């Protein structure tokens, strides 16, 4: 074996070990957590769904805004759409893996969704942006409830 082959094998082993450790760690953390009431699981599942809907709505609205141009591509508006899409996906991921920090993520997500909704509502008469605002408000409401858990 040459030195490069040994190095490559070591890197592969470390990468697979880190992935396996993360899975074992996540499984261990989940197993150690106290059982949540069934209603908590349903609420969390609903919140994940709302986060995924808001993520998609923001990304689709961003595409629409980029195609429309003009005031629709104001940097502050584009940043909020991106921020909202990303925090919604991250928050859904926190809940899906049973993170103990999901309430923190949900609180932040609710705040960003509200800001995004206000930014979208500023474009009065635009049905695409109004729909995005509605979706973000629904997500914000669901996340506020989960943040209390």
Feature locations, PLM:
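Membrane-interfacial loop-to-transmembrane-helix junctions in polytopic alpha-helical membrane proteins
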Residues: 7, 41-44, 71
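Amphipathic/hydrophobic helical signal segments and adjacent flexible N-terminal regions
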Residues: 15, 20-27
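C-terminal segment of N-terminal export signals and the immediately downstream linker at the start
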Residues: 25-59
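Extended, low-complexity, charged alpha-helical tracts
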Residues: 50, 62-138
